[in-house]
């Protein structure tokens, strides 16, 4: 739980800068404040449920039982139980001081400005103000002189086909400039209806009046906030100086603004423009006749003066409000006028006259309320904003809505420029009434309601993606429950439009319709499932190949057949079928989700292909049609040879991939085995080196390092066995101490040593009976442990007796340096006694020291008056050299240590002869094995190179 930084103090000063103490000071002055902070690391665990509860405010409780004020348990307001002392009506300054009406109004405005950000998005408001400001600028620029970008077709542009005569264009330009100057500098005369006070100055020119008038009109419509914005934006524009309070035209501006608010003033600029429009046609014709000799400009190239693009776009969509009081009367009159006429003798229903479209303004407006879809279908326009969709389409005029009564066809107006399609019952008079009845009754409940422009691109895009990726994509999107894709639900009002677009894109993705011209055309929506299911199952022949690409999406208009579909009219097109064989690449995307590797079952592959092809074709919605009837799916028909070829190709690719993976796995396995073999060889060589030469730990470490170099070159030093003794190996070993590795003394000397040891043992037993019981069992057990294993395997065994015998003086400071240099991993035994056991042979110099120490121990054993303190003083170097390996047992007494050391020496010399013979045999066997392994490794290296 606690991190590495736990408990770390961070001294800081209040001001953020730590003050350093002076050279003589202690740093704890009165002006210095320290903050001691202890930090501990902690883990944070993700708890989604707790986070969701916090976000929903489930941890909040009502304050004092008031559900309007919710606080958490750490809120300081929990300590307040009564706020009556702080209520505004009792304790505010306004209790004694009553504001006047003007002051209260100003205070209310100030409060509104203070708390504006609480209930208003300031960024959105600023963007709206910018937009309104742009509109004002455009309105100010539309005074007839110029637009945002004006047209100039004068002599400034060189035309090589025209003679270069500049006299007439220059005269015309001067004339136009004079007219503009006259218009702009025309003095302003107040109109008769405008009674301007005598103390208010009038603007000098008509242009200045127009600017003031438009600004006042704009501020009246948008609010006083825009006046402040205009004043700030146009601070450097001299034309808007009248907005300043100290300007002489500001009273006139305020007067015009007040008159507009009261409705006593109409904008003069608009009335002038209306007069110009009325008198425009006659005067324009005369001017055109006069100016034909000049530079003629076609009327379509003129800049539009007062026409708004937004109004043009919205004009065809104007519909009478169905909630209007007069709308009920209009609908009643239309229902009376468009009542079904008695059918004629041949059974065809009576057609409503063309007068119905123009007689009423509502029907005339609805004539244009549609838009055409890419496949020839046209839908009714979306309702105007603020009107419910269901009520709008249910309360449409009778001349436009669908009648479900038998014998009455729909009267949806056709697109402009085309005639209304003929009724479908003219061909067969006997069965016409029944067919029309079934169609209209089946299609009446569902109507394609076009979505508004902000939702329509989303629906179109999703329908296209579903047609391309299959129904699984639609299911996954629906499962997310996103608000933007609610139209995927069957109960949604735009679901019919979505299904229609999906079917349209499916036909487009499938390469177009492949039905014959003689079969009845299917309706594009799910509402005509009964007819389309029956006709589609029989109609499309199976041998028809899929048209390649998407080229057959182009259709030509047919002559007589069309399906009248409520608010959806489908123009009839005769499908053109090209028997072009589909390319291999066009069919490959159907096999995206292919089979697993090494799966050879053809049945599984075929079932997967069928499943993928069905997922890419949309099924009709179950809400609109009975589930037993299914629409025929248009999937591409592949021949048996193509399927077999593709399956064989896929199997071959799968097998190749599996073989490549197996090869890679085998290669990696072989490389790992080679690495393991090399590691084993290195360890075996190192182990044999330690068997042949039981070196001290430092030399073992050096030897291990040198074996890496030996392995790389492939050369292994092979020790020679001469007379059962191992000759020294010179490679990789320091040449300083050769006497430690050779067995120079012959067998006779060893026998003499054994005899001397027996004599010493008898003396120690007789002279020191006190320590007999403690030294004897230890020495015996130790000798047993020694003889139970060869000396080669006793590299890590520690001696129990820690006696400091004089023989340890042979370990010089050089040995200590080697022990320090070797890493701890190689220092398996830290006691010098263990290393002494490994090196059984000693140099003649060491033997002399040994004999002297023996004579000293004999003398000390005879005279027991020697104190331990003197012994410690006599051997300071040995004690200091091996202080790391001395245990607390040594404090028992120097005599006990002496007896243990002597017994250990005797045991070591007795076992030396036996150990040497056993070791030589083991070494011979192991060296034979090593030579065989080295020969094999050399062969491997040569073959690998």
Curated annotation (Swiss-Prot):
Annotated protein name in UniProt? Splicing factor, suppressor of white-apricot homolog
**Looking at the Swiss-Prot or TrEMBL record, what is one Pfam family this protein matches?**
DRY_EERY
Name of encoding gene:
Sfswap
Q: From the record, what ranges are coiled-coil?
A: 632-686
Compositional bias, Basic and acidic residues, is annotated for: 9-21, 169-178, 589-598, 643-679, 733-752, 811-821, 895-908
Question: What does the record give as the function of this protein?
Answer: Plays a role as an alternative splicing regulator. Regulates its own expression at the level of RNA processing. Also regulates the splicing of fibronectin and CD45 genes. May act, at least in part, by interaction with other R/S-containing splicing factors. Represses the splicing of MAPT/Tau exon 10.
- UniProt lists compositionally biased (Low complexity) regions at 335-352, 427-447, 514-527, 615-630, 871-894, 909-920
Renumbered to this chain, the Acidic residues biased-composition regions fall at: 284-294, 528-540
Q: Which UniProt keywords apply?
A: Acetylation, Coiled coil, mRNA processing, mRNA splicing, Nucleus, Phosphoprotein, Repeat, Repressor, RNA-binding, Transcription, Transcription regulation
List the GO biological process terms: alternative mRNA splicing, via spliceosome; mRNA 5'-splice site recognition; negative regulation of mRNA splicing, via spliceosome
Q: Which PANTHER family match?
A: SPLICING FACTOR SUPPRESSOR OF WHITE APRICOT, SPLICING FACTOR, SUPPRESSOR OF WHITE-APRICOT HOMOLOG
A cellular component term, taken from the record's GO annotations: nucleus
In this UniProt entry, the residues modified to Phosphothreonine are 639
Enumerate the SURP motif repeat regions by residue range: 211-253, 458-498
Q: What is its main location?
A: nucleus
Q: Where is this region: Disordered?
A: 1-28, 156-185, 271-301, 332-355, 403-448, 512-564, 589-680, 712-921
The protein's location, in the record's own words, is: Nucleus
Compositionally biased tracts (Pro residues): 412-426
Residues with the N6-acetyllysine modification? 315
State the superkingdom: Eukaryota
Basic residues composition bias: which ranges? 753-787, 795-810, 835-861
Signal peptide feature range:
none
């Amino acid at each position: 739980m606690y991190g590495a930084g736990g408990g770390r103090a961070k001294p800081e000063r209040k001001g953020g800068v730590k003050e350093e103490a002076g050279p003589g000071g202690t740093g704890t002055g009165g002006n210095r404040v320290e903050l001691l902070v202890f930090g501990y690391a902690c883990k944070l665990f993700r708890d989604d449920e707790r986070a969701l509860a916090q976000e929903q405010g489930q941890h909040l409780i009502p304050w004092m039982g008031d559900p309007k004020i919710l606080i958490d348990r750490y809120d300081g307001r929990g300590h307040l139980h009564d706020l009556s002392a702080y209520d505004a009506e009792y304790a505010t300054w306004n209790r004694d001081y009553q504001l006047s009406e003007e002051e209260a109004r100003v205070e209310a405005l100030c409060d509104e400005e203070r708390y504006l950000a609480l209930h208003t998005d300031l960024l959105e408001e600023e963007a709206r103000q910018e937009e309104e400001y742009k509109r004002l600028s455009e309105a100010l620029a539309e005074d007839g002189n110029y637009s945002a970008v004006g047209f100039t077709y004068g002599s400034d542009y060189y035309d090589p086909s025209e003679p270069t005569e500049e006299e007439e264009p220059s005269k015309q330009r001067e004339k136009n400039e004079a007219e503009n100057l006259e218009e702009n500098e025309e003095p302003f005369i107040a109109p008769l209806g405008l009674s301007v006070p005598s103390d208010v100055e009038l603007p000098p020119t008509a242009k200045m009046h127009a600017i003031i008038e438009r600004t006042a009109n704009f501020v009246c419509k948008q609010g006083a906030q825009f006046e402040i914005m205009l004043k700030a934006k146009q601070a450097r524009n001299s034309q808007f100086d009248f907005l300043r309070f100290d300007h002489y035209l500001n009273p006139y501006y305020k007067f015009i603004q007040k008159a507009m608010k009261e409705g006593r003033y109409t904008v003069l600029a608009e009335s002038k423009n209306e007069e110009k429009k009325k008198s425009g046609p006659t005067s324009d014709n005369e001017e055109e006749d006069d100016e034909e000799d000049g530079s003629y400009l076609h009327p379509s190239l003129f800049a539009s003066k007062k026409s708004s693009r937004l109004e043009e776009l919205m004009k065809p969509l104007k519909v009478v409000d169905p909630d209007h009081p007069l709308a009920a009367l209009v609908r009643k009159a239309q229902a009376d006028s468009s009542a079904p006429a008695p059918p004629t003798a041949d059974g065809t229903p009576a057609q409503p006259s063309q007068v119905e479209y123009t007689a009423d303004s509502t029907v005339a407006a609805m004539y244009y309320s549609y838009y055409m879809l890419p496949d020839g279908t046209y839908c009714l326009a979306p309702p105007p904003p603020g009107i419910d969709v269901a009520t709008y389409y249910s309360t449409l005029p009778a001349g436009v809505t669908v009648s479900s009564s038998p014998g009455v066809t729909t009267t949806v107006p056709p697109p402009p420029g085309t005639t209304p399609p003929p009724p479908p019952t003219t061909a067969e008079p006997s069965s016409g009434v029944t067919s029309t009845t079934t169609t209209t009754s089946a299609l009446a409940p569902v109507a394609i309601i076009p979505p508004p422009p902000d939702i329509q691109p989303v629906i179109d895009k999703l329908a296209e993606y579903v047609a391309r990726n299959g129904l699984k994509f639609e299911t996954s999107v629906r499962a997310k429950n996103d608000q933007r894709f609610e139209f995927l639900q069957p109960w949604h009002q735009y679901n019919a439009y979505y299904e229609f677009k999906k079917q349209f894109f499916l036909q487009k993705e499938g390469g177009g319709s492949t039905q014959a011209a003689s079969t009845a055309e299917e309706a594009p929506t799910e509402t005509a499932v009964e007819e389309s299911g029956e006709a589609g199952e029989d109609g499309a022949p199976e041998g028809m190949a899929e048209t390649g690409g998407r080229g057959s999406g182009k259709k030509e208009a047919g002559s007589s057949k069309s399906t009248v579909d409520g608010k959806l009219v489908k123009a009839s097109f005769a499908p053109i079928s090209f028997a072009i064989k589909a390319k291999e690449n066009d069919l490959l995307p159907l096999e995206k989700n292919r089979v697993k590797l090494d799966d050879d079952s053809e049945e599984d592959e075929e079932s997967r292909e069928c499943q993928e092809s069905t997922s890419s074709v949309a099924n009709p919605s179950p809400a609109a049609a009975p589930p037993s009837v299914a629409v025929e799916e248009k999937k591409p028909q592949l021949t048996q040879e193509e399927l077999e070829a593709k399956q064989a190709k896929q199997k071959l690719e799968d097998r190749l991939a599996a073989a490549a993976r197996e090869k890679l796995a085998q290669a990696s396995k072989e490389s790992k085995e080679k690495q393991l073999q090399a590691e084993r060889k290195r360890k075996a060589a190192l182990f044999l080196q330690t068997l042949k030469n039981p070196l001290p730990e430092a030399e073992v470490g050096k030897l291990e390092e040198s074996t890496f170099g030996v392995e790389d070159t492939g050369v292994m030093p092979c020790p020679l066995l001469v007379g059962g003794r191992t000759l020294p190996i010179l490679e990789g070993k320091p040449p300083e101490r050769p006497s430690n590795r050779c067995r120079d003394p012959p067998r006779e000397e060893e026998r003499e040593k054994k005899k001397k040891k027996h004599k010493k043992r008898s003396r120690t037993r007789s002279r020191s009976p006190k320590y007999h019981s403690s030294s004897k069992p230890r020495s015996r057990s130790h000798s047993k442990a020694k003889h139970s294993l060869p000396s080669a395997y006793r590299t890590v065994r520690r001696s129990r007796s820690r006696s400091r015998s004089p023989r340890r003086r042979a370990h010089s400071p050089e040995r200590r340096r080697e022990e320090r240099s070797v890493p701890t991993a190689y220092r398996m035994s830290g006691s010098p006694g263990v290393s002494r056991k490994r090196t059984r042979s000693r140099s003649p110099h060491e033997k002399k020291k040994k004999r002297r120490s023996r004579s000293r121990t004999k003398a000390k054993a005879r005279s027991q008056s020697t104190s331990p303190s003197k012994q410690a003083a006599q051997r300071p170097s040995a004690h200091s050299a091996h202080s790391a390996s001395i245990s607390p047992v040594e404090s028992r007494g120097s005599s006990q240590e002496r007896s243990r050391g002597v017994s250990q020496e005797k045991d070591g010399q007795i076992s030396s002869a036996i150990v040497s013979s056993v070791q030589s045999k083991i070494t011979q066997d192991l060296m034979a094995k090593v030579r065989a392994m080295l020969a094999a490794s050399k062969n491997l290296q040569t073959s690998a190179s």
